[in-house]
């Protein structure tokens, strides 16, 4: 009689590469260090797990024990698809970025960096931990979302979250409907096609800062545009392509969060309803697919 085939015992599931997180990300999240600072600490053998020093580029489970200089780094809650809490308890602030502020932490050419601008409101220590969700160039102003939790920055800034960036733009001459149609249809820029989701003149009920409503500029010089991504100087380049250089640019909305009555330099925690809308957007966002591994040649 033929010998019956034996089935191999089921193998225990080991964490896949996509389940694991780079150790420098975990160290940055738990310690408040920048990603570069975490890399420096790891390279100096100051970070350990289970009694051994971790290596640069190593990946660990999100709850793996970590110590920095012998002190335990407590694990923080991470977003969970099962719980639907994509923000994972992270605090998110709405801030009116003034003109002249560079949204980086260190820039030899910056007049005012992000931490310097936030120190009067948050204190130097907390201001140094704040990260911007997306960016606004130095000469632009308006709504910028901020958080201390690095893990939520990329999901909220990525175009697949579907969070519109809304702007009020001032130009020397009035933008006509034919030009708005060009913005909505799409324009080829140096880095590819770009288009406005919405482009039109401003309305009486648009959420605009008080100094815009009562300013010296003719209301006809202002227009409203929303886009679905945050490429470098994208709005300015779109207006430049229709021969209407932007004189002043104010971001008035980011997804469900509005600039509202904030004045330059002011910040507030986002409301519970804004938070829920951001969470819904992240839950609904298509998840990135893991890249297939190419077969090894034989």
What are these language model-derived features?
Residues 2-4:
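BZIP DNA-binding basic region
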Residues 6-298:
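Basic, flexible Lys/Arg- and Gly-enriched helix-loop patches that mediate nucleic-acid binding at interfaces
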